[in-house]
């Protein structure tokens, strides 16, 4: 469906986000954006993902030369257990602790998407509930040894081997991957309408 949406800049180096945008035919330029992803004191998970998605989009806007700037899409994903944000694990030990917390229970995955064209910004939020089966020690060890979840929020990748752990998903598969396509399509569609 190329041509349905205007070209944009993606404030992310995530291969998953790039593949998801390509899946819906969006032409994009990739921007390597670094923002501090530390939660603020007493920050709610929804506020956290909104803040980071917007920070990434704004940083991407500022990174482009003024002439020929493209609208910038930023996204952020958080895995939430009992209102606690599980970010990307610092190391294998922390990833193991996260998997243990997720084992045999449900958690939420929040992904916020922000699109900015300068001073103006739009947002969308995807909220999904993911249920893990009870993991055995061998399953945890094998998954940790794979290294697959070490750079992912909550220490797992739904599109990889961790799919074997998920007994139920309510919400957006692409949102759990890191870029909810329905919400992204809404933002890009609104941008396209304003260009007419």
UniProtKB/Swiss-Prot annotation:
The active site is at 76 (proton acceptor). Signal peptide: none annotated. One of its GO terms (cellular component) is cytoplasm. The keyword DNA-binding does not apply. Its main location: cytoplasm. It catalyses: dTTP + H2O = dTMP + diphosphate + H(+); UTP + H2O = UMP + diphosphate + H(+). InterPro entries: ITPase-like_fam, Maf-like. Its cofactor is a divalent metal cation. The record marks 16, 77, 159 as: Important for substrate specificity. GO terms for molecular function: dTTP diphosphatase activity; UTP diphosphatase activity. GO terms for biological process: nucleotide metabolic process. Belongs to the Maf family. YhdE subfamily. Nucleoside triphosphate pyrophosphatase that hydrolyzes dTTP and UTP. May have a dual role in cell division arrest and in preventing the incorporation of modified nucleotides into cellular nucleic acids. This is dTTP/UTP pyrophosphatase. It comes from Nitrosococcus oceani (strain ATCC 19707 / BCRC 17464 / JCM 30415 / NCIMB 11848 / C-107).
